[in-house]
Amino acid sequence: DGMGLSEGPSRRGLGAPVRTAFFMKAPGEHPMASLMSGRQGSGGGRGGRTRLALLLSLIWVASGQDHSTHRPASFWARLLGMPDPGETGARTVNSTWAELEQRGFVKVQRGPHAGAVSQITLLDESASGAPYRIPTGSEGDRYIRVPEALWLAPVLTPEVTGPGLALYLVTLRTYGLARNKDRLTFPAGTFHDRYGLSESTRKKGLKNL
């Protein structure tokens, strides 16, 4: 099909479990915000969106198996709705895997020759470099579940920006914590401390949603 799911996920109906430590693992340490930013601390732009979308997709596909996957880059490019998934999209995916590895989110085992499919192993989403394990939901290991509709509906269309995708995740977490689920708020005064994201990202994300 158009998204390449015929090759794909074995966790139908389960969505992607994302630890709340991805938002803030310690005061001042925000893995999602750092993933959205360039390594020099600048805005992540389109690259930030691709990194976040690809990591979420890997969690969806690989979190329930041995936490690794051996799928061609074109599969991921189709899953993310990239143009020209067999060529340009695939190159973008491969360069993004390399960036995610440098940042401590994945391990890449490259094939024996140029053009061979790499094995991608998911690591802990806090970017600690620790092996991935399925979150338990117990104290200290809480998580949100990203609905598979993100990929199947799909919600993850080209119109969704990096800030929009980040705010989508923040909304899922806020909804889970809210007492009044009919009216969610994202106060500017606490937003940066909680998520490490700028006021500009908050505004752009809310507008995009």
Language-model region placement:
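Generic N-terminal amphipathic/basic segments
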Residues: 1-16
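Short, Lys/Arg-enriched N-terminal segment that forms or immediately precedes the first helix
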Residues: 18, 23-44, 144-157
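Helix-boundary capping/turn motifs
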Residues: 24-28, 46-51, 68-72, 143, ...
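Short, charged/polar micro-motifs that form catalytic or ligand-binding hotspots
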Residues: 40-45, 86-90, 154-161, 192-199
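Detector for short helical micro-motifs
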Residues: 45-66, 159-179
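Winged helix-turn-helix DNA-binding recognition segment
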Residues: 60-118, 176-209
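Short, amphipathic alpha-helical interaction segments positioned at domain boundaries
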Residues: 122-159
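A short mid-domain helix/strand-loop element embedded in enzyme catalytic domains
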Residues: 138-146, 170-185
